[in-house]
Amino acid sequence: MAELPMSTHLFARLLSRVHAVCAALIEEGALPAGIDLSRVVVEPPKDASHGDMATNAAMVLAKDAKAKPRDLADKIADKLRAEELIDQVAIAGPGFINLTLKPAVWAEALRAVLDAGAGYGRSTVGGGEKVNVEYVSANPTGPMHVGHCRGAVFGDALANLLDTAGYDVTREYYINDAGAQVDVLARSAFLRYREALGETIGEIPEGLYPGDYLKPVGEALKAEHGAALKDMPEAQWLPTVRATAIAMMMEAIKGDLAALNITHEVFFSERSLIEGGRNRVAETIEFLRAKGDVYQGRLPPPKGAPVEDYEDREQTLFRATAYGDDVDRPLLKSDGSYTYFASDIAYHKVKFDAGFANMVDVWGADHGGYIKRMQAAIQAVTAGKGALDVKIVQLVRLLRNGEPVKMSKRAGDFVTLREVVDEVGSDAVRFMMLFRKNDAVLDFDLAKVIEQSKDNPVFYVQYGHARGHSIFRNAREVVPDLPEDSKARAAMLRQAPLERLNDPAELELLKRLALYPRIVEAAAQAHEPHRIAFYLNELASEFHALWTHGRDLPHLRFIINNDAEITRARLAMVQGVVSVLASGLAILGVTAPDEMR
């Protein structure tokens, strides 16, 4: 059998064959010309006993073909039986087509893993499209807390995933440095400045930030300005103190993110929208006004419970209802300043004008009600050419042995990100923050994430990678020329008699490896990096189970002392496993250790 092209994974290749069969049926008149094949998929069947792959082609094409799904399935199945890769074709239920592939396919799929090495799973599905992923964007008013941590990890892993799938990714952080909260920060820092000068400031007043983390800001202000700011009116000292406090908070935030191996290419200041000789917020409002999307009007009172920001007055409104929102939205406050929404529209227009028609924002759970208006605004400012996907990241409940963790005294009222990373490590934080879908509340137990057991997914997956390398070290008694270098080892092992990997458990593991590129593409298109974490856990579980079988059934051991050829074949399978585990862990931003102590 000819080798599979490395650039095309099995599922994509089978889909192309199904499309070719449909094209032949169009030629024969069994399908109408121009029929839409975009809904046709090839995927693993829900029940593995039904085969290796399944297609819905007959189900989704039957209506346009004016045929019964089962009858159309018969025609498609007849042609698929002639395909080189396919061993058996069966029609199930109303017209699903189940495919069983020839055993030799899985040996060639393993060779594709070995040939691609670290590049296995990389895809061109993104086509180089530019995508902007904005994540974290925590207010620069204090250290990052554990709630920020989940959004940071999710956004970073999503950016890695999109890059792996062939998108041109920019990682961006939006600095909220123009709102009232940074003035509160400045007043809080000014108290710490007075404290640094020797004053007794007493208890921090209600409404200011109480944490000790602002003491270094006070010391820095003293070092730079001495007592010069102390007796100035607030209007004079506030801009200076605010700028210093924001700069120091952002450096602290960058340090917190670095502890999780997170970096951004772009830090965009909200204040830059209205400073520097150009007011982009005003420009955006006028741009929308010229389109008829901004008008002067009054909003009706909200139904049900009162809304805090409702004002019964004539105001400048964005016609959000024309783009699917429930109500039109104010752009100016009663004091003439811009609403946060107005700044947000301008910010996203800047991104679109920079070439990002594809934008992803990662927001906290408390911003869910903001999505509709923002997506309406994107449609308006991009004339329907831009797309915004908002990923909501739910809350994290921090536990220790099932009990809630007490708050941090230094931070004031929350547990800091740095405290969590220092205790359990970046790998445990990143993996476990991704081991649940982003829109579900996550329980993060500080004791359980460092357990060395199969009940701890991060340990289980990393141990799979380490176990693979342990097998390589032990195999040198049987295969003394086994290279240390991963590429050289893969090049040697691809020559092994891989067709001897015919035990059902071995074949299942090879099938799991062949699934990985499809998982990457599907996860990238859905913006769901948790799918990678789930897949890695399943792969590691199958690998560990096969190793355990070898303890009980000597003929299934990875290393057979008197059979170098089957040993080489099984080492090739192990090489495939460690390559895919390393690739997936890299997407998640988690290390792949060669040994664990």
From Swiss-Prot:
Top-level taxon in the UniProt lineage: Bacteria
GO molecular function terms noted in the UniProt entry: arginine-tRNA ligase activity; ATP binding
Localization, UniProt: Cytoplasm
Alphabetical list of SMART domains matching this protein: Arg_tRNA_synt_N (SM01016), DALR_1 (SM00836)
Pfam families the record matches: Arg_tRNA_synt_N, DALR_1, tRNA-synt_1d
CDD domains per UniProt: ArgRS_core
EC class: ligase
Record-listed E.C. numbers: 6.1.1.19
Cited InterPro entries: aa-tRNA-synth_I_CS, Arg-tRNA-ligase, Arg-tRNA-synth_N, Arg-tRNA-synth_N_sf, ArgRS_core, DALR_anticod-bd, Rossmann-like_a/b/a_fold, tRNAsynth_Ia_anticodon-bd
Any one Gene Ontology BP term: arginyl-tRNA aminoacylation
A GO-annotated cellular component: cytoplasm
Catalyzed reaction equations: tRNA(Arg) + L-arginine + ATP = L-arginyl-tRNA(Arg) + AMP + diphosphate
Motif 'HIGH' region: positions: 138-148
Keywords, in A-Z order: Aminoacyl-tRNA synthetase, ATP-binding, Cytoplasm, Ligase, Nucleotide-binding, Protein biosynthesis
Record family assignment: Belongs to the class-I aminoacyl-tRNA synthetase family.
Subunit structure comment from the entry: Monomer.
Name by which UniProt lists this protein: Arginine--tRNA ligase
Native source species: Rhodopseudomonas palustris (strain ATCC BAA-98 / CGA009)
